[in-house]
Regions:
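N-terminal alpha-helical signal peptides/signal-anchor transmembrane segments
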Residues: 7-10, 23-41
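Structured segments of extracytoplasmic/periplasmic soluble domains
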Residues: 13, 29, 33, 121-129
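Extended amphipathic alpha-helical segments with heptad-repeat/coiled-coil character used for oligomerization
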Residues: 41-67, 72
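Intrinsically disordered, low-complexity regions enriched in Pro/Ser/Thr/Gly and acidic residues
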Residues: 63-186
Length: 186
């Protein structure tokens, strides 16, 4: 039994690491075009310009991922929607399944491990490129972390995130009565 549990845990970590690696690959490719991508939707009206077709044309879909209806499905089961909005390149990352209950979106599952790894191994090293890394929540307070260009004494800065900060932020999405989304804005 211990061997099976160990194997299962190792496979989960392998999938998570492959997912983080995939986001890094995608981001490295998109950063080469960041100035153009940001201006695809220059209005500050919140309108989104979806980049699924652009990602496919640039051959940036990470190995093992699939692109369906403009959304990226990862090796770990998370789903990312990438778009330009308000002069920013934005990733909306769903870390689990969800459903609607009386027109309210509720997470059925939320991978705190993947959330923690993305914040620690993806967002934190990109502190100088990111403007924001945050967790959108439908029912409670949003937690923002700011990139270097917006970092100040009054803000929570990505570069200063501790493992405890990351765990607390990601663990806040374990409840079953709301929907959480990890958001990265470049």
């Amino acid at each position: 039994v211990g061997g099976i549990a160990g194997y299962s845990k190792a496979m989960e970590m392998w999938k998570i690491n492959k997912t983080v690696e995939g986001y890094s690959y995608l981001t490295q490719g998109l950063m080469e075009h960041i100035d153009k991508l940001r201006t695809l939707q220059p209005n500050n009206d919140g309108t989104k310009y979806y980049l699924g077709d652009t990602i496919k044309e640039l051959n940036l879909v990470p190995e093992g991922w699939s692109l369906q209806s403009g959304r990226l499905f990862t090796t770990s089961g998370s789903v990312a929607t990438v778009f330009s909005r308000n002069n920013r390149l934005v990733y909306d990352v769903e870390l689990g399944n969800y459903h609607y209950d009386d027109n309210i979106i509720i997470s059925d599952s939320f991978s705190t491990k993947l959330c923690q790894e993305l914040m620690n191994k993806f967002a934190k090293p990109l502190h100088s490129s990111l403007q924001y890394a945050w967790i959108f929540k439908t029912q409670s307070t949003v937690k923002y972390y700011y990139g270097d260009s917006l970092c100040s004494n009054r803000n929570n800065c990505i570069i200063n995130m501790t493992l405890s900060d990351i765990q607390n932020a990601c663990n806040s999405c374990i409840t079953n009565n709301e929907f959480c989304l990890l958001v990265f804005e470049f």
